[in-house]
């Protein structure tokens, strides 16, 4: 028996004691951050996202369509890619009726129109699954209706976010969205601002690897007013 085999044989014969699973979620519950109110939490989230050039519009369930249209028109967009297999995609298309912005359905296989997609599409529109306050983040799920390319390729990304699904931290989002129990989607991505990169000279550039503009339509609950949030937000 070689020295290697002798060592391995001793290891296999040794008593193996199972290690106790660490209480990861209990640790984060105890050590995690919190805020005194929903307003303070939203202000923190907004400040973190705006610090990296994210545009945030505080909207309601009844007026987000109008704000979306005005923001899109303000950017001089010629077209916008919509997930028409979703309810919010259908509503967004209706919001653009009689405008100069052409709504385009995301319904073709990417290989059949790759050149057009990468060169002629001005903006994309999607929904967000939830938000993470501490880091100023949106969590999005990729799906056949809203693939990752919808929010990654166009130079402008509009994202509809229901702020009632705001979590304090990442682990709260994992628990709240039941990602362990229900299983992870094929692709989960965290967005904290438009695409940005810096070279060795620390020159910051936006849009190199994704959208140069991120526009969030943040739907507020009835008991919170946009005026409450814009003070020092």
Curated annotation (Swiss-Prot):
SUPFAM superfamilies: NagB/RpiA/CoA transferase-like (SSF100950). It comes from the Bacteria. Pfam families: LUD_dom. InterPro entries: FTHF_cligase-like_sf, LUD_dom, NagB/RpiA_transferase-like. Belongs to the LutC/YkgG family. Present in outer membrane vesicle formulations which are used as vaccines in human. This is Uncharacterized protein NMB1437.
């Amino acid at each position: 028996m070689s020295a290697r085999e002798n060592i391995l044989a001793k290891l296999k014969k040794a008593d193996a004691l199972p290690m106790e699973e660490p209480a990861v979620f209990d640790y984060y519950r105890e050590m995690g951050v919190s805020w005194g109110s929903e307003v303070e939490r939203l202000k923190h989230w907004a400040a973190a996202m705006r610090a990296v050039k994210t545009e945030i519009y505080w909207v309601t369930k009844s007026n987000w369509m109008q704000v979306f249209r005005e923001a899109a028109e303000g950017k001089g967009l010629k077209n916008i890619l919509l997930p028409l297999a979703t309810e919010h995609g259908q509503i967004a298309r209706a919001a653009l009726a009689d405008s100069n912005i052409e709504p385009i359905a995301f319904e073709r296989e990417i290989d059949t129109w790759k050149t057009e997609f990468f060169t002629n599409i001005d903006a994309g529109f999607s929904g967000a699954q939830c938000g993470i306050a501490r880091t100023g983040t949106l969590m999005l799920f990729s799906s056949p209706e809203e693939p990752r390319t919808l929010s990654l390729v166009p130079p402008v990304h509009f994202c509809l976010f229901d702020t009632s699904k705001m979590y304090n931290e990442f682990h709260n989002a994992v628990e709240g969205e039941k990602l362990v129990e229900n299983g992870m989607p094929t692709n989960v991505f965290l967005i904290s601002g438009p695409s940005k990169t810096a070279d060795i000279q620390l020159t910051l550039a936006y849009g190199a690897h994704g959208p140069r503009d991120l526009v969030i339509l943040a739907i507020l609950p009835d008991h919170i007013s946009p005026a409450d949030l814009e003070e020092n937000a």
